[in-house]
């Protein structure tokens, strides 16, 4: 699945950019025998996405996928915004959403745990992601992160 997601991401990213949108995430989900291809995107100019944007992108993405055909079996296409709990999928996201509260889940335990919540402080000059928790200032390498999201239960401090 991961390979297919990467191929779709690589092929869709520049196409969406040409349409004024930024690709957030591509995820192929198997539930029983049904496949769903989830595409998350946002407008480049204001980082938002409304229903008209989703319909517009869905038509373009569907046309592209019919020609490109990366998934051999049938599937359902879902196009949406990143939502309030927007995933942080690229290293640039950690700088863009600086000062927002985030939840970061690591691939391996660090300081005895895998999940950390705190305020994003951006990316340092060495490419380490900075997170300020209630008790500490922590640095992570991007490749150590399994998944991360904006925490919608906290408003941005200064954005």
Indicate residue ranges for each PLM-predicted region.
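Short Lys/Arg-rich amphipathic alpha-helical segments
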Residues: 1-159
